[in-house]
Design a protein with these regions (language model features):
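Alpha-helical scaffolding within the catalytic cores
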Residues: 94-107, 130-134, 178-188, 217-222
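Active-site machinery of serine-nucleophile hydrolases
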Residues: 75, 79-130
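C-terminal catalytic histidine-bearing segment of alpha/beta-hydrolase fold enzymes
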Residues: 198-207, 212-288
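Gly/Ser-rich "nucleophile elbow"/oxyanion-hole loop immediately N-terminal to the catalytic nucleophile
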Residues: 66-71, 124-156, 166
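A domain-start/cap signature at the N-terminus of enzymes
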Residues: 12, 38-75, 154-159, 164-167, ...
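Short, proline-enriched alpha-helix->beta-strand connector loops that line the catalytic pocket
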Residues: 112, 190-195
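Primarily recognizes the serine-hydrolase "nucleophile elbow" in alpha/beta-hydrolase
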Residues: 141, 147-191
Length: 288
């Protein structure tokens, strides 16, 4: 392991060594290592839901077992990539939710109660208002702790994580963008948001440094800029990784415990989002 960027937490490693190099408390390691080899979730076990608003955003949802009494649970929101756009409320779960359902596996094997939702967008971009609509709807249906809402996504979904956090940085407890990009401008509001960023150094779709070019930049540049203004994002870069590194990333044993340890100080009132005057981005494609 070696530092790639100046900062407190960067790593580059051989993907085959991921599990062996993690040092975790025994009970966490046992549960997560067991989960790494077993898929506990069938697509049909995730409820099909549509938001009860004008956007009518489709999403899939599951609550893992283990809730005690009136306990409020963390919410993990997964944003898919652009090739899974549509309205069938199914495509976003392809490839085991592009690996994101490994987090649900880990929760089930570790008896960790949480709510996982995987919305679907009709755009090749994730307008933040669609993300907010899903969170707002899920808060009304499931016993969610509004101080523990986490965003993760891959490819254009990773970019959607960046853009949603920029829009409402105070509302999400952490972000885990993978193979994503965003504009270099406007990073200051998210410098204090806990982040764990993943990217492949050989990504030939969304360049790790330059994104798609122009105003858009990739994960390495984003992390560097955040650290320059006082942010402390974690950053994992796979030296031989191409664009689809997310199965490796979601298999990282420390990821779920790290994520669930994050909280916002004061919960947002999602019933008031989007804020007055917010204009969602529509018709914007990030395809080259």
């Amino acid at each position: 392991m070696r530092n790639l960027l100046a900062g407190k937490w960067s790593e580059v490693f051989d993907e085959a060594d991921v599990l062996s190099k993690m040092r975790l408390p025994g009970w966490i390691a046992a549960a997560l290592f067991a989960a790494a080899g077993a898929q506990a979730v069938e697509n049909d076990s995730l409820e099909k839901v549509w938001t009860a608003d004008a956007l009518h955003v489709p999403y899939r949802a599951i609550q893992t077992p283990g809730r005690i009494g009136q306990e409020r649970l963390p919410l993990v929101v997964f944003l898919h990539g652009d090739w899974q756009d549509g309205e069938n409320n199914e495509s976003q779960l392809a490839g085991y939710g592009n690996g994101s359902l490994l987090l649900v596996d880990q929760a089930i094997h570790g008896n960790i109660p949480l709510v996982y939702v995987a919305p679907q967008t009709t755009h090749s971009y994730w307008p933040p208002d669609r993300v907010a609509a899903v969170v707002r709807d899920a808060l009304g249906r499931y016993p969610i702790d509004p101080r523990r809402i986490y965003l993760t996504g891959i490819s254009d979904g990773g970019s959607g994580v960046w853009d949603t956090l920029k829009t409402w940085p105070e509302c999400f407890a952490a972000g885990v963008p993978m193979s994503g990009m965003t504009e270099a401008a406007g990073l200051a509001p998210i410098a204090r948001v806990p982040l764990w960023v993943f990217h492949g150094a050989k990504d030939n779709d969304t360049d790790v440094e330059t994104g798609y070019g122009g105003a858009m930049v990739g994960s390495r540049a984003i992390v560097r800029d955040l650290r320059a203004i006082g942010g402390e994002p974690r950053y994992t870069e796979y030296p031989t990784g191409m664009h689809p590194i997310w199965h490796h990333a979601y298999s990282t044993p420390e990821l779920l415990p790290w994520l669930l340890n994050q909280r916002v100080g004061t919960a947002c009132d999602f019933s008031h989002l989007p804020p007055p005057g917010f204009a969602p981005v529509t018709g914007l494609s990030r395809n080259r």
